[in-house]
């Protein structure tokens, strides 16, 4: 099986559902659960989106929960590789923001740095990406 399928199935084993966009089940080009990478034996080097990263508690020391009714965020978003290569600052730099809502979904925000483990992300590289996720799915 190609690496994209393997990573996608690992995502299911972690409890994740598909990552869609605009009503299309497989459409998120920033996440292995969106099936938008290369379907070759070489695969595509990219990661999971902000909602999945939050649910897995990856880089949890750099997660920030925001209640938009009572606070804001004043900091810098950095890519996941800043943690891995040790260039992240002790304070003021974060990997994932969760913006809690009173509705059925929350928003997750991440800087989709196109480098290292995410150097072949199919779209939105080096951009801030916002993912909307139903709360009850767990990621």
How should each PLM-predicted stretch be described?
Residues 1-118:
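Extracellular hydrolytic enzyme modules, especially secreted metalloproteases
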Residues 121-128:
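Short coil-to-beta strand junction motifs in C2/discoidin
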Residues 131-132:
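Catalytic Cys-His active-site segments of thiol-dependent hydrolases/isopeptidases
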Residues 136-139:
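Contiguous ligand/interfacial binding patches
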